[in-house]
Amino acid sequence: ELDQWETEAGQFVQAQYESALSMPDPQPADLLTHDFAPTPITEERGERAPKGAEPTVMVDAALFAIKELMAAHPEALLYGQDVGGRLGGVFREAATLAQKFGDERVFNTPIQEAFIIGSTVGMSATGLKPFVEVQFADYLWPGMNQLFTEVSRSYYLSNGKWPVSTVIRVPIGAYGSGGPFHSSSIETAVTSIRGIKIAYPSTGADLKGLMKSAFYDPNPVVIFEHKGLYWSKIPGTEGAKTPEPSEDYVIPFGKARTALEAEASTIAAGESAVVVTYGMGVYWAQKAAKAFPGQISILDLRTLAPWDRAAVMAEARTHGRVLVLTEECSSPSFAQSVQGAI
């Protein structure tokens, strides 16, 4: 019987090999096809600030988004290090979810980022929709091979058949006394990977809206969540706490928002400038802008892949002066690539 199986397997492989050889050569135009599957979220929908909604800290905005999605979609899972019922996440970002949805849908994993990220390929292929968490951005490196080789390329290599539908949450940035192992900003490394969408919101409303959009997007999405904005404890970051949007609120990727607008008179006089930034940079820019009243606009990118080129170029033309602000090292960086595009 084993010999028969071996013979049948050999015949199957040979037939597939001969079929592949008979295929026409790839065309150059095919090189850029199937990098992303079409998304159903193409415009902002729902209420961003419903009447009577209470101000919500950023970490809770994400928690409520996932809670709503898991209640509505039995295929949704959440797993990662310490997100299970005993702790509920080191930032309380998964609190109560295991108790509400059970250990089968919310569970801990080994301390192995390659497994956490790589497992989403199989989960997605079977029809599940995993939220996974890498506990700190500094810990993403062991999972980069899976992110680059498997997750980002599945849709392309399968000729548009198998996108990896997953949301990867990554707390990021310097906060508290994290030291060299809990403070890194690594968005440049991830933005260099084609086939992944990337969000980096600065407010609770944006985090919830982008979290919902990421879930309904068939492509892999990485969401960077700045630890220093989770509770708005850092002076000047109170703006990250926003009224909780409605359950159906979604934001399309690639659409920036204006966080501060210069006065028309200073723009007309040629005395204005725009700061293009994201995440914690929004609040650094707001603080600095107080020294230049009426002269500064702030454009919050909200998503880094894709980023809103049209809005950035329009602001550059309007003001003639652009400062791109990032927490990362300046060179090489994603911010530097934005500068280059301008």
Predicted regions and their residues:
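Thiamine diphosphate
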Residues: 1-18, 22, 32-224, 228-230, ...
